[in-house]
Amino acid sequence: LLVGCGDKEATVAAPTDSAGSEPAAVAEASRPMAEVSQARLDNAAEQPEQWLTYGGSYDETRHSSLTKVNRDTLSELGIGWVYDMKKPRGVEATPIVVDGVMYVTGSWSVVYALDARTGEEIWVYDPEVSGEDAAKGCCDVVNRGLAVYEGKVFVGVFDGRLEALDAKTGAVVWSNVTVDQSKPYTITGAPRVIKDKVIIGNGGAELGVRGYVTAYNTDTGDLVWRFYTVPNPNKEPDGAISDEIFAKLANETWGDTGAWTTDGGGGTVWDAIVYDHVNDQVLLGVGNGSPWNAAIRD
């Protein structure tokens, strides 16, 4: 992990020996961490010195209004510090930064909390994804990010778990298996937090699954609702909030036979989840059908 700053020589951040040990900048036992309220998320764009949520704000524009880095100062940038994640696989996550602490995921769904100023390690959490589960993925054991809210860090684990971690120590607060682990489901996308709910999707449509997103209570981990993106293969209710819309509009547009009825139909929401806070709606980007080959899907 490389972090840039103005015209300075790089420092190499030394990992600590155990989860939970804190460098001086964050050593105060009473110091709150990841104190991100709903109000802060609603107004994330007004705090450009922070990066509170995936995409920077609910709009997910990924735009920063900070002005110190511009055409005139670009040549002055250098490497501020370097941190070795010790996992030689792909890294696709954008870090979350809250009040001087950086939270970021690496490959194998490992979560790191670092001092954003120095790169010193605060804690590391490894969910210990197995090689057997890794074989289910289409595109490496990457992870695209996490969410923070009211003292917790939320991560979607490659093997289908959604976990809440204590932002101060990295300890697991709660853990839920969100998928049928006998099927080739994976999670590589970042969770989104909206009004005391953490929302997570999944991947795996390339190999034959049925897509859905699920909302869990951020405090307890209890399931709040689930929305499927393709109909039930038997056109039956799932006991999910998607039942009504399928009965009214979708079931009749899907055939009663075809490989989709046995291979799930696909439509996984493997990353794109956006909250429209003006209309209080969640918008989903839906992935490919399953089987991928449309000639045998229908």
Where do the language-model regions lie?
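Beta-propeller domains
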Residues: L66-I79, G106-E128, D298
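Short loop/turn segments that connect beta-strands within beta-propeller blades
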Residues: D115-T118, E128, D166-T169, N217-T220
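Blade/loop signatures of beta-propeller domains
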Residues: G20-I79, N234-A247, D298
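Bacterial signal peptide processing site
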Residues: C5-K8
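A structural motif specific to WD40 beta-propellers
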Residues: G80, E120-V124, A171-S175, V224-W225
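Repeat-blade elements of multi-bladed beta-propeller folds
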Residues: W51-G55, G90-V110, K136-L162, T186-E206, ...
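Short coil/turn linkers that define WD40 beta-propeller blade boundaries
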Residues: L74-L77, G119, G170, G221, ...
